[in-house]
């Protein structure tokens, strides 16, 4: 949970992970949530043999995998059918736009008495730890640590101060961090909640992020080849940043990609949305494959209601 679970301190957990070689693993997850819940029968699970009032107006096209057909507005993804699987067994039993349900698999009230269920990224951060000083979980969507404790909250980059600047050196930063620990010592003696342990982890994570510069470099798309940026397009920059963050050592990157709540004008909206998703997702699959990251990186694309 927080840093005192099972009698283990955060340092103990990190030490145990190092001994088990957990920290050397480069397995990663890119969790893309299509906020609003895209219509499955108009995207990856078309029903061409159903009656016209059920099947929708889009036609299926064949991918490079025999028997796997997807929407006609996914021509680029159709060339990468061998790089993804369509999972049709997922279902949703909550009739609202609950990102909590998609991120945890449980109702919001589940285990609420002890903090609630943790999201996918928080579980991965707890089990896998960090790599190369990068935060294990970067989340731009609705994610929370639940009963695992505050230390497993997602890291949410905000602002531009992600690198050392001006006269601030690594030594000066270390000195200030040491002073902060001394000042916190008075509070620690009276703390029984684990909050100080969590604060230690936050501080160390912030120091690691600032001193290494890896996360700042990954987030700055000016460091990316312009041809790659053009391939993803402006609409696909979140996908590109996710790939760069994984390369920097982040275990889980989660973000929302909205615009899928199509109660009205479904087909008009999808004709606008689907080509953007086609370009961004196909570019991500292609990139991961070309960079040798495809065997270690899982990409999940989904929305509410089991879609």
Label the model's feature ranges.
Residues 1-307:
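Ligand-binding pockets and gating/stacking loops
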């Amino acid at each position: 949970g927080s840093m005192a679970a099972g009698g283990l301190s955060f340092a103990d957990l990190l030490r145990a992970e190092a001994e088990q070689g957990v920290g050397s693993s480069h397995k990663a997850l890119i969790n893309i949530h299509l906020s609003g819940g895209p219509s499955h029968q108009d995207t990856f699970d078309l029903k061409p043999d159903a009656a016209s009032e059920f099947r929708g107006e889009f036609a299926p096209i064949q991918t490079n995998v025999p028997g796997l057909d997807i929407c006609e507005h996914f021509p680029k993804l159709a060339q990468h059918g061998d790089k993804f699987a369509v999972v049709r067994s997922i279902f949703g039993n909550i009739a609202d736009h609950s990102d909590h349900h998609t991120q945890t698999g449980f109702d919001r009230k589940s285990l609420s008495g002890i903090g609630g269920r943790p999201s996918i990224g928080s579980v991965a951060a707890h089990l896998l730890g960090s790599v190369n000083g990068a935060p294990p979980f970067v989340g731009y969507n609705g994610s929370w640590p639940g009963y695992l404790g505050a230390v497993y909250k997602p890291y949410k980059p905000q602002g531009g101060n992600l690198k050392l600047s001006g006269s601030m050196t690594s030594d000066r930063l270390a000195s200030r961090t040491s002073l902060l620990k001394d000042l916190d010592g008075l509070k620690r003696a009276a703390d029984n909640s684990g909050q100080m342990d969590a604060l230690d982890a936050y501080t160390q994570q912030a120091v690691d992020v600032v001193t290494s510069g890896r996360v700042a470099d990954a987030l700055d798309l000016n460091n990316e080849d312009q041809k790659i940026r053009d391939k993803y397009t402006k609409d696909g920059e979140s996908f590109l940043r996710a790939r760069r963050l994984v390369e920097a050592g982040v275990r889980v990157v989660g973000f929302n990609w909205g615009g899928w709540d199509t109660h009205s004008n479904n087909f008009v909206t999808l004709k606008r949305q689907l080509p953007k998703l086609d370009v961004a997702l196909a570019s991500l699959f292609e990139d991961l494959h070309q960079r040798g990251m495809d065997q270690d990186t899982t990409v999940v694309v989904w929305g509410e209601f089991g879609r």
